Amino acid sequence: PVNISISNMGSGVAAIDFTGSKTASTFQVIRVFLDSSQTEELGTFSSQPILLQNLTTDEPYFLKIKATNEYGNSDFTEVLGVVTSANTPKVLIVNGFDRVSGTDNSFDYIRQHGVAIHNAGYIFDSANNESIINQRVKLNDYSIVDWILGEEGSATSTFTVEEQKLVQNFLKNDG
């Protein structure tokens, strides 16, 4: 799965949206807990977007997805997160830390960012930077954007001109 985002859909419901899995027959969703290697399988789904229901309201959920077909499994996606609530999220956390070589990228920094934002009294949605670039998620739907870049290097695209323009537009529109 690519272009991944997780959005609050109301009390106890979250939507996981993505593209790039046309040959997948099912999608396994795993919850990852903060400060623990413990995980919980939330289910296996056959359609998208995936709607997770009966989640605990006002509790951060950190999730990763794996696609499956008759030939095997994809790798798990990066970890993204959401807090479900009756209120509309004002904060979007964007994971732009894609680097895989020459770094210790655990692909789950959203857990630390999400908990800090939630402890400050905010609920949040999240997305990877590709879903922003490809206009699947709009920065201007939020008041606050936390864009995680990590230890990107010059051999990789750090914060592309396209990403910078999207953030500039967000700031010009009172973000």
Residue ranges of predicted features:
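Beta-strand-rich modules
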Residues: 52-71
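Pro/Thr/Ser/Gly-rich low-complexity, intrinsically disordered linker/stalk tracts
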Residues: 1-24, 57, 71-88
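Short beta-strand segments enriched in small/hydrophobic residues
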Residues: 89-102
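Extracellular low-complexity, O-glycosylation-prone stalks/linkers
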Residues: 22-41
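Tryptophan-centered short beta-strand motifs
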Residues: 37-45, 73-76
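Helical hinge/lid and interdomain linker segments adjacent to catalytic or ligand-binding clefts
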Residues: 101-175
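Short, glycine/serine-rich, charged loops/turns that create anion-binding
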Residues: 22, 96-99, 152
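Short S/T/G- and acidic-enriched coil/turn segments that sit immediately N-terminal to beta-strands
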Residues: 45-51
